[in-house]
Amino acid sequence: MNIQQIVEQLKQNEVVAYPTEAVFGLGCNPNSESAVQKLLVLKQRSVEKGLILVAPCLDYFLPFIDTTAFSQADWDRLQAKYDRPTTWVVPAKTTTPKFLTGQFDSIAVRLCDHPAVKQLCEQAGFALTSTSANLTTLPPCRTAEEVKTQFGADFPVLDLPVGEATNPSEIRDLFTHQLFRQG
């Protein structure tokens, strides 16, 4: 599918696969509980784990993140360019749905400079949920063909290459720098 077709799927609250910095992600409209539920069922993932949001700029995250405790250093860290994809765990607004945050009062966000993510967010008008495109026992997909093999030939996938990163994103707490996942 092309960008416009994937955007239409997103607007219809469907789950899609799209390329990120290292692997294909499964994503949907984070404002749609029904879309997120489809994603969780597809991934056999507990709602308690919470989800990552990706977008090309911070504006897309502002409806979900509580920035009241952010220092200038926190803003700088969140927006900095790193040698690997970096996801930051930040405080969530009290209005952020539990189907995104799970058992936490925080949410994970990643600025993603992959052109596909940029185009999808700009055309859809929202950030995307992001979890690796793979079934539980299989490795994350790195090509559109691998996505179709795992999820079926008709699964909506944006057939563009992934970025240059070799590993999925590192996940850290923005304030404490605690490492949750090595990148």
Curated annotation (Swiss-Prot):
Cellular component GO terms held in the UniProt record: cytoplasm
EC number, as in UniProt: 2.7.7.87
Catalytic activity annotation: L-threonine + hydrogencarbonate + ATP = L-threonylcarbamoyladenylate + diphosphate + H2O
Catalytic class of the enzyme: transferase
InterPro entries in alphabetical order: DHBP_synth_RibB-like_a/b_dom (IPR017945), Sua5-like_dom (IPR006070), TC-AMP_synthase (IPR023535), TC-AMP_synthase_SUA5 (IPR050156)
GO biological process, one term: regulation of translational fidelity
Assigned keywords, A-Z: ATP-binding, Cytoplasm, Nucleotide-binding, Nucleotidyltransferase, Transferase, tRNA processing
Start and end residues of each YrdC-like domain: 1-183
Annotated localization: Cytoplasm
Family named by the database record: Belongs to the SUA5 family. TsaC subfamily.
Name the UniProt record assigns to this protein: Threonylcarbamoyl-AMP synthase
Species name: Pasteurella multocida (strain Pm70)
Lineage: Bacteria, Pseudomonadati, Pseudomonadota, Gammaproteobacteria, Pasteurellales
Gene name tied to this protein: tsaC
